[in-house]
């Protein structure tokens, strides 16, 4: 994960649109004194520890819930897409950040604005990527069961 000062070179329209908003916020800060914080989420994952909030999709596409459904017998065998990525184990790598950490980051961003005028952007990730196979191995270790895939 690059730090906030790392060059920003979006590779797709989605990324370009996010960078465009950051530039608009910077322009609004310079022109009108509008203070802002843009939070750059990486891959949000998880649920509240008390289970009050979390993901619930009729058609689940996220890796971690599908791995857990598969290992716990609540769904079909996991389908792993791609095994030829230029990564150590050939599977895709993602930097996951827990939803409760994201919620805390929002509160910290509001506090930050109290003493830091202008437009700011912060990366919200854990700083380390995890491959699909690493996620599968972690689920197996936590549950004590092999993930069918």
Model-assigned labels for residue ranges:
Residues 1-38, 43, 50-62:
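Catalytic helix-loop patch of NAD(P)-dependent Rossmann-fold dehydrogenases
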Residues 3-5, 45-48, 116, 146-149:
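A short alpha-helix capping/helix-coil boundary motif
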Residues 22, 49-50, 114, 138:
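Amphipathic alpha-helical interaction segments
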Residues 40-45, 82-84:
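Short, small-residue-rich loop/turn micro-motifs
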Residues 48-51, 87:
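Alpha-helix C-capping/helix-to-loop hinge sites
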Residues 64-149:
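C-terminal substrate-binding subdomain of Rossmann-fold SDR/epimerase-dehydratase oxidoreductases
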């Amino acid at each position: 994960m690059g730090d906030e000062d790392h060059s920003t070179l979006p590779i797709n329209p989605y990324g370009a649109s996010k960078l465009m908003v950051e530039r608009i916020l910077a322009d609004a800060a310079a022109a009108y004194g509008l203070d802002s914080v843009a939070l750059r989420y990486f891959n949000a994952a998880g649920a509240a520890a008390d289970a009050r909030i979390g993901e619930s999709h009729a058609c689940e596409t996220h890796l971690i819930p599908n791995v857990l459904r598969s290992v716990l017998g609540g769904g079909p065998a996991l389908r792993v897409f791609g095994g030829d990525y230029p990564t150590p184990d050939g599977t895709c790598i993602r930097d996951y950040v827990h939803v409760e950490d994201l919620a805390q980051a929002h509160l910290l961003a509001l506090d930050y604005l109290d003493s830091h005028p202008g437009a700011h952007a912060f990366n919200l990730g854990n700083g380390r990527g995890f491959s699909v196979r690493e996620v599968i191995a972690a689920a197996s270790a936590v549950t004590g069961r092999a993930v069918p895939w």
